[in-house]
A protein has these predicted regions:
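A short, surface-exposed helix-loop junction/capping segment
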Residues: 9-14, 53-60, 234-238
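Conserved active-site segments centered on acidic
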Residues: 14, 37, 73-76, 235
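Nucleotidyltransferase catalytic core that binds NTPs
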Residues: 3-5, 30-32, 53, 86-271
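Short, structured active-site "lid" loops
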Residues: 57-85, 251-265
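N-terminal, charge-rich interaction modules
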Residues: 3-6, 10-29
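Glycine-rich, small/polar surface segments that engage phosphate groups of diverse ligands
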Residues: 19-68
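Electropositive phosphate-/nucleotide-binding environments in soluble metabolic enzymes
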Residues: 23, 27, 69, 73, ...
């Protein structure tokens, strides 16, 4: 009998539904969740883009790193978007996107660290868990068991069943970004844009600005000289050819801009 049986039963009986994406590890958690009766009440989709080419296809791009927080956040944001498309009857507040990337012990010695990342995207927040193993200390099965535990703990917390991940360990870093009300309105399509200025932007400079660098500033200054208009940096939170931005990514992007730069958030994925 699974040690997670009662927790998973409560997940299936909760009012939440979710899409779960796993790459490089975490498939044991999917198995644990699906083998408990009632999984169709909560699981909308479980997807395993295991090969690098499969993850490229899922993200519509080749990520800088296949096992990283940024990649996992993108996967979770896309999973949440998929949940909203699959289940149009459930309120977005009751839908979740969960993703995990992992680099675990295998049949050869890895150069990099053994680690995993879990991200949960919801209507109101993004939640991330970054964990680094002590390399060579545990077997693959032992590492996978820890990944499974954290996925189920994080998921049960997101479903309101318990407090979720409560571990106090230097191996783990937890970050939660709560969405501003305006971000939620933009995601829900209730407003068309959010601007750092009270003025309607006249000159738009679109880009991901991940990160913002001196070249962007030089282009902005040149555009202002040629047009006489003050440019606003546009960050599209949901491009046609990219996964949506998580709240982590939205916050990190807008915090780059000093008060001397205007910016605007939109959902205008196409011109």
């Amino acid at each position: 009998m699974s040690q997670y049986l009662e927790t998973i039963k409560k997940i299936h009986n909760s009012s939440f539904r979710f899409v779960l994406i796993s790459s490089g590890g975490g498939t044991n958690a999917i198995s644990e969740i699906l083998k408990v009766p009632g999984a169709s009440n909560s699981v909308l989709e479980a997807y395993v883009p295991y090969a690098k080419e499969s993850l490229d296809h899922y993200l519509l791009r080749q990520p800088d790193h296949y096992c990283s927080l940024d990649t996992t956040l993108s996967m979770a944001a896309k999973a949440y978007s998929a949940a909203k498309k699959i289940d149009t009857k459930t309120h977005p507040k009751k839908l979740l996107g969960i993703a995990v990337t992992a680099s675990l012990a295998t049949n050869y010695s890895k150069k990099g660290d053994h680690k995993f990342f879990i991200a949960i995207q919801t209507h109101k927040y993004s939640h991330s868990f970054s964990y680094q193993f002590t390399k060579g200390e545990l077997s693959r099965d032992q590492e996978e068991a820890i990944v499974t535990k954290y996925i189920i703990d994080a998921l049960s917390g997101a479903c309101g069943i318990n407090e979720g991940v409560q571990d106090q360990t230097p191996n783990l870093r937890i970050e939660k970004v709560k969405a501003e009300k305006s971000w939620i309105k933009l995601v829900d399509g209730k407003i068309e844009f959010i601007s750092s200025s009270n003025q309607i932007p006249e000159l738009i400079f679109p880009g991901s600005f991940n990160p913002l660098h001196s070249g962007h500033a030089e282009m902005s200054e040149l555009a202002e000289k040629k047009t006489g208009l003050s440019p606003a940096y546009e960050i599209c939170i949901q491009n046609a050819d990219k996964p949506p931005l998580s709240y982590h990514e939205i916050q990190r992007t807008v915090l780059q801009f000093s008060q001397s730069y205007d910016w605007v958030l939109t959902k205008a994925g196409k011109f």
